[in-house]
């Protein structure tokens, strides 16, 4: 009997079981040992197959697909270092909650630790970073199909957050054989093959669904107090809902760039440096934080130093999310669900002077950046470039801080990022996944080092199903380090690492459109034309290296000098 045929039957059952748990997208890298999985994915009509030659980028492509679709996404790679390349995306998913299923083909046990080619110790390779790990045995008809499908159903039922690593050893041969062999093994599942449900319907009830643990019995008391709302990373609808909720309570809402709240008090990273604003916020009796991954340095400093009577943090993600370790309440619950259970009561705003400081800071930004074509000016005016019914992907490092500090995005406009571990690896690949999941017009904005780090992901952007603009802010290096007290003599060589490149040839190599505007009107016109003509265009904005960091520091100093407002 043929080992290759049974490998494929085993893999076909594995992939079909995953589709019963909502897996629609699967990302595949080339490899021989993964042949059973690849052929099974290609033959399954329920799966949309995405391919990429770089496993690190492939993992981030899956991450982006999972972010935007909110569905579990599977990945297939061959054995060896291909598996290790999935580590960065797996780590990010563990911190931000996207569900990834990593199917890593492996050599059979007898080929491990004996000098066999492309054979490494893959079991436990990812340490504690996966939420769950399953080490499957080598496929054999001695193991029932019921065992395999039940094992997968149980693991998928438990996967509420993060990654599932399924290690899949396959023995050779991997090709050929009589496809009719071992039909009885598959047929033992009966009409399950014609069904659409899991074999084992294991239900894991989140606590918030079967008992009112998320309900705060004293909410009706605290909603009458002076409160402050901090909005971190959350979904678009949650952001809209939170904005209306805080406004009804009369509580100031300090929104992160990823909060999708519309940042009703914009330029918070600036006005939070004002002493009087800090004095006002110190009067808060309760602080409610929704979502995590705060970007603003000044907001993080205030969040760390604040001492309200109560500090509540609401997020659907498990675990500790407060680096300041406040005494208070950690409520694991979706933001929208929590808001529905804790209705607001219309009250008079208690901290109206904060709006004055915010307006003054925004006016200072407009005055300072007037007539400039700079990194800071692009961040400030970014909302003007957004496509209708589209989405935004923001990179890490300096650009996301400038957008957070100087810009104001529309309430409820979808914004995506990799702000869990906040690495610059895989940003273009993640943006490609976000675009593919939604088929919406997409603006992605990253720095030059981020673009270089994931340059071969431009191959993924050739296949955009809707207009896409990759906006590369080329400040010649990692200029985030110009914001930090790095030693000046070593800053350029060891921190910023300028590369003195432009991206025109990269765009040509991958058959992408390209433009390099020299003014804001040119940039705006190029972007708007991209939304009309479709495809992917790389637009490069070349700016003076340290100007963005210097402008932010200058504005922070200027805003601290704004005259105090009488309470």
UniProtKB/Swiss-Prot annotation:
Keyword Transmembrane carried by entry: no
NCBIfam families assigned: menD
Protein name in UniProt: 2-succinyl-5-enolpyruvyl-6-hydroxy-3-cyclohexene-1-carboxylate synthase
Catalytic activity: isochorismate + 2-oxoglutarate + H(+) = 5-enolpyruvoyl-6-hydroxy-2-succinyl-cyclohex-3-ene-1-carboxylate + CO2
Pathway per the UniProt entry: Quinol/quinone metabolism; 1,4-dihydroxy-2-naphthoate biosynthesis; 1,4-dihydroxy-2-naphthoate from chorismate: step 2/7; Quinol/quinone metabolism; menaquinone biosynthesis
UniProt cross-references to CDD domains, sorted A to Z: TPP_PYR_MenD, TPP_SHCHC_synthase
Keywords from the named record: Magnesium, Manganese, Menaquinone biosynthesis, Metal-binding, Thiamine pyrophosphate, Transferase
Gene name per UniProt: menD
Family under the similarity heading: Belongs to the TPP enzyme family. MenD subfamily.
Subunit structure as annotated in this protein's UniProt entry: Homodimer.
GO molecular function: 2-succinyl-5-enolpyruvyl-6-hydroxy-3-cyclohexene-1-carboxylic-acid synthase activity; magnesium ion binding; manganese ion binding; thiamine pyrophosphate binding
